[in-house]
Amino acid sequence: MHQKTPEIYSVELSGTKDIVKTDKGDGKEKYRGLKNNCLELKKKNHKEEFQKELHLDDHKLSNRELEEKYGTDIIMGLSSTRAAELLARDGPNSLTPPKQTPEIVKFLKQMVGGFSILLWVGAFLCWIAYGIQYSSDKSASLNNVYLGCVLGLVVILTGIFAYYQEAKSTNIMSSFNKMIPQQALVIRDSEKKTIPSEQLVVGDIVEVKGGDQIPADIRVLSSQGCRVDNSSLTGESEPQPRSSEFTHENPLETKNICFYSTTCLEGTVTGMVINTGDRTIIGHIASLASGVGNEKTPIAIEIEHFVHIVAGVAVSIGILFFIIAVSLKYQVLDSIIFLIGIIVANVPEGLLATVTVTLSLTAKRMAKKNCLVKNLEAVETLGSTSIICSDKTGTLTQNRMTVAHLWFDNQIFVADTSEDHSNQVFDQSSRTWASLSKIITLCNRAEFKPGQENVPIMKKAVIGDASETALLKFSEVILGDVMEIRKRNRKVAEIPFNSTNKFQLSIHEMDDPHGKRFLMVMKGAPERILEKCSTIMINGEEHPLDKSTAKTFHTAYMELGGLGERVLGFCHLYLPADEFPETYSFDIDAMNFPTSNLCFVGLLSMIDPPRSTVPDAVTKCRSAGIKVIMVTGDHPITAKAIAKSVGIISANSETVEDIAHRLNIAVEQVNKRDAKAAVVTGMELKDMSSEQLDEILANYQEIVFARTSPQQKLIIVEGCQRQDAVVAVTGDGVNDSPALKKADIGIAMGIAGSDAAKNAADMVLLDDNFASIVTGVEEGRLIFDNLKKTIAYSLTKNIAELCPFLIYIIVGLPLPIGTITILFIDLGTDIIPSIALAYEKAESDIMNRKPRHKNKDRLVNQPLAVYSYLHIGLMQALGAFLVYFTVYAQEGFLPRTLINLRVEWEKDYVNDLKDSYGQEWTRYQREYLEWTGYTAFFVGILVQQIADLIIRKTRRNSIFQQGLFRNKVIWVGITSQIIIGLILSYGLGSVTALSFTMLRAQYWFVAVPHAILIWVYDEVRKLFIRLYPGSWWDKNMYY
């Protein structure tokens, strides 16, 4: 008979065709292609190459066909020679690491990004200005050369620092390498050998046992009770059985293939390697992350926006005054020098270093709070987050199944789900509990890994699946040494749990002093266990299982199931000694023992409980205007129960289904607007258009996506971003990588996360805790606030530095301040105070504000610019000019005499220039007085910048509400300002190249009234903002 050639089953492994898990009603999980997403991505990203197809038919082949295909022997394995040839041909069995940016490129990016460009332009303009001056005067001052060199040096030093910070985070990341197994047990040359897993090749025969990770894609040849955890690949949380049986066309669903890097939870398996390294399924998926581009961070956009503003203002003012200078009959070359001077005066030279240090300080603070920041700019992004799409397992929950409730003696008891299980309050004296605890202990294949004698019970590593681990630890805490109990009740026969039977059964020799007999114990799906029972134990005695007791059972079962908990039923049967003597041989294939008319003992339910810190964290998110969306592969009932327990769904919120149930009407009849919450399944999401998803995201504040695959996160993230939201996404699986890269900020789990997820993320949670994200949000908001304050502080003095050039050109005064003097303000006295603002504590309303809108709430907005430049900036300029005019008046030049004096003042051959009192001044004397004027203007700005620094501690609250001495680093900054000012004025007075002279002490106090005025003025501004929220004053004076 002609045999039809097996059809190759194509599995698309990308964010374009999704793998969606749906329940067909027969208990089997199905995966369906999400074509909508494919079309959207094709239209949107034009990335046909994003689709990668894996053609796999090995699961359909017989053992003989496999041997022929791979040239191997199932019993003897490959020869070492052949294995070496294949290794040379295919390369090592490891995933190619993501393409790394060369270190030199990373370094150069730090040199030319954001503020750096502005400083480089300033440096080149300085050199051009010197060139112009030198062309007409060979003895031209080298000030502009020095200024250009210093600006270049600032960029280089700051770039080195930023590069070092990011390299440090990268090095920490490289230490995470938990996903790939290191060793593999292989049969070669008829011998079992342990070799590095990287040396595996196709055709190798490998053996894997419970607790090991699968070292490659393998086709199962034989297995004993093997179950694997595929969650990092498919998002499937339930353990999946593995056998040599071909059960499904789809290789992702068939039982006879195990996938690279998934975990064997229990049992043993022997298999043939069919794919290695990048050719494995997980290798294909891991490569998808490179198909989704990194998005520019909000803070990078803000800095770019700020650079454009500063450059625009500088160039506009420069050109304006170039035109004025030319119209006032200045030489064109002189006018160009003025133009360059004005542009350079507008460049905030110290801000680049300040921003870099501020981001680094915050990153260090966050590392102490278990948030590892890979990209410094990601810190602020977290602060502007408006939607958090969070995993359930391990992030919102403790990532450990825990016994939550017990039902026996017709009562539901609440178990302690805290970290240590120490406070169990149910009745442990009941004889029914004694029987139930024995079943829980014996009908369990989980075991503690050896060598953990001193490790607390709840932290011990276990070989076994999550449910059995929960039962083992529960028994160990309450009953003591479980392994000792099992030794005393030796297991003589066992039927492992499987999806067909839906029960697990074991038979044990009893440690009965009155005579040996056998006890059969069973656990499994409650309805299946009840079917096998004719009696029920109540208060230690067996009673007939009648309709009344069955109804009580069903009520309890439905109540526990409705809580989203996984419920198991337990029963037992003492086998009669006369029918089953000590020498009896049990045969599990022949089933030569009874499996009906058993005694039902009780129910036990388990749940992965919420972390204790999460409800408070979710409440903080609500106050902060952040929408928290749960995205999980779990059952909708479980997801909804956890969402309610942590506050993602409020206690009084109802879904459409809840309303339908309450009113006893069909779901279609419910007005969707009456529902405040929504639980959307992956199956529903698969059939939704983008518009329908957008409608759900826009209309519901409380949303849970359940039964979704990790790939569907990409659709959800894109949907959120279409709402103009800044989206943070958590992920741990390989399949989460595209969503992590697409999100504004990707957050990987440090403990449970795969390497692919960590590589794609911007931030890694070292404790996998949702509360750490909220801490990060607060830190991110704080950094945005503090950057605003720093920029406002830095911009204020720009007007005071710019006005002297404008007055110099228009009014013709002797130059009030030189470019080198300005540099000492920007890179000397102001650097430490600017950095000190990074240490400022949060204002009281920081987590009660709505998230900032990325297109409207800018880092540098109109109120900030207007207030800094035209309010405080002009006050500073007036105060500094007051000191300048005071010095000149004291020396004999009254203000009216200085007007239009510039041309005569600067003539080298004029040595008899008369002041207001007729005294004659030589060129050298005038130059020394000019340097004294520089120093006076410098001191005037310095004194007022102290007041400016203090007022920048808050934007809304009074300084006295915030605490004047709460941030001690501010006072370090003020002290540094004064010390640097004193050193420049007195210690280096003889160094005329710096253009500073020794200043009389009284000149330091001339600007103090202006400094006090600045403080009082700002306190009044903040008072009116607090008194009249939403008013014109609030909108225009709150920056």
Curated annotation (Swiss-Prot):
The modification Phosphoserine is found at S958. SUPFAM superfamilies: Calcium ATPase, transduction domain A, Calcium ATPase, transmembrane domain M, HAD-like, Metal cation-transporting ATPase, ATP-binding domain N. It catalyses: K(+)(out) + ATP + H2O + H(+)(in) = K(+)(in) + ADP + phosphate + 2 H(+)(out); K(+)(out) + Na(+)(in) + ATP + H2O = K(+)(in) + Na(+)(out) + ADP + phosphate + H(+). InterPro entries: ATPase_P-typ_cation-transptr_C, ATPase_P-typ_cation-transptr_N, ATPase_P-typ_cyto_dom_N, ATPase_P-typ_P_site, ATPase_P-typ_TM_dom_sf, ATPase_P-typ_transduc_dom_A_sf, Cation_transp_ATPase_P-type, HAD-like_sf. One of its GO terms (cellular component) is apical plasma membrane. Mg(2+) binds at D732, D736. GO terms for molecular function: ATP binding; ATP hydrolysis activity; metal ion binding; P-type potassium:proton transporter activity; P-type sodium:potassium-exchanging transporter activity. The ATPase activity is regulated by monovalent cations and pH. Up-regulated by K(+) ions in a dose-dependent way. Down-regulated by Na(+) ions. Inhibited by Na(+)/K(+)-ATPase inhibitor ouabain and H(+)/K(+)-ATPase inhibitor SCH-28080 with an intermediate sensitivity to completely resistant Na(+)/K(+)-ATPases and highly sensitive H(+)/K(+)-ATPases. It is a multi-pass membrane protein. The chain crosses the membrane at residues 103-123, 147-167, 304-323, 336-353, 788-807, 818-838, 859-881, 934-953, 968-986, 1002-1022. It comes from the Eukaryota. GO terms for biological process: intracellular potassium ion homeostasis; intracellular sodium ion homeostasis; potassium ion import across plasma membrane; proton transmembrane transport; regulation of pH; sodium ion export across plasma membrane. Its EC number is 7.2.2.19, 7.2.2.13. Gene3D superfamilies: Calcium-transporting ATPase, cytoplasmic domain N (3.40.1110.10), Calcium-transporting ATPase, cytoplasmic transduction domain A (2.70.150.10), Calcium-transporting ATPase, transmembrane domain (1.20.1110.10), HAD superfamily/HAD-like (3.40.50.1000). The catalytic subunit of a H(+)/K(+) ATPase and/or Na(+)/K(+) ATPase pump which transports K(+) ions in exchange for Na(+) and/or H(+) ions across the apical membrane of epithelial cells. Uses ATP as an energy source to pump K(+) ions into the cell while transporting Na(+) and/or H(+) ions to the extracellular compartment. Involved in the maintenance of electrolyte homeostasis through K(+) ion absorption in kidney and colon. In the airway epithelium, may play a primary role in mucus acidification regulating its viscosity and clearance. The ATPase pump is composed of a catalytic alpha subunit and an auxiliary non-catalytic beta subunit. The alpha subunit pairs with the beta subunit of gastric H(+)/K(+) ATPase ATP4B or the beta subunit of Na(+)/K(+) ATPases ATP1B1 and ATP1B3; this interaction is required for the formation of a functionally active pump and its targeting at the plasma membrane. Belongs to the cation transport ATPase (P-type) (TC 3.A.3) family. Type IIC subfamily. This is Potassium-transporting ATPase alpha chain 2.
